[in-house]
Amino acid sequence: MELTLHEARVIGCLLEKEITTPEQYPLSLNSLTLACNQKTSREPVLELSETQVQIAVDSLNRKRLISEQSGFGSRVVKYKHRFCNTEFSELQLSPAALAIVCLLLLRGPQTPGELRTRSNRLHEFKDVIEVEDCIRQLMSREKPFLKQLPREAGRRESRYVELFSAASSQLETAQPESASHTVAHVAVSLDAEPLELTKRVTELEQQVAELTQKLDELIASLS
């Protein structure tokens, strides 16, 4: 399973709303678009049109990850996920695992501490250790659902990323490139600094020599 950024956002929103606002679930296209474009609890913040959301929904429908539902006497089509924990889903997740996967789909890479703090509406973890235990279970499957990222400078905890979407693989390839670019930039700066200093010293030596010559000429003319 490899979801695009928009597909991952749609699935994440459906998972979230099923738990946090069950009375409004399934979601209409308009409600789903509003959920995808929330300014809070989303990273990155998107501004998707209903057309873009519909394209993602249609693609997920073809992948059998979404189903349509029409109420009796209503023309409004609503959507529900078939991502996990349904009779049609191969994937079955515990409430704790579902909360972690949902948060990673909606907000990208996060630390165990961040996941615990942000999961209170989805699942109540008693402490960070419980989050870490659940993460280990998700990583220890035959086909892991999560991956640990290299710890960043200044961070006490490593971040974890879900492996359901293309965004996670792009992040993996982007990080080494970014790191190598930074190292190269520092190396160039360090190499460039002595060269600039040497050039400046040469210019000053030349100016001193010219001034010395003019001073000698002035003394000679006065004697």
From Swiss-Prot:
Domain of life, per UniProt, equals Bacteria
Coiled coil located at which positions?
none
What Pfam families does this protein's entry cite? DUF480 (PF04337)
Alphabetized PANTHER family for the sequence: UPF0502 PROTEIN YCEH
What the entry lists under HAMAP family is as follows: UPF0502
Family that this chain belongs to = Belongs to the UPF0502 family.
Protein name listed in UniProt: UPF0502 protein Sbal195_1802
Please tell me the species this chain comes from: Shewanella baltica (strain OS195)
Lineage, opening ranks: Bacteria, Pseudomonadati, Pseudomonadota, Gammaproteobacteria, Alteromonadales
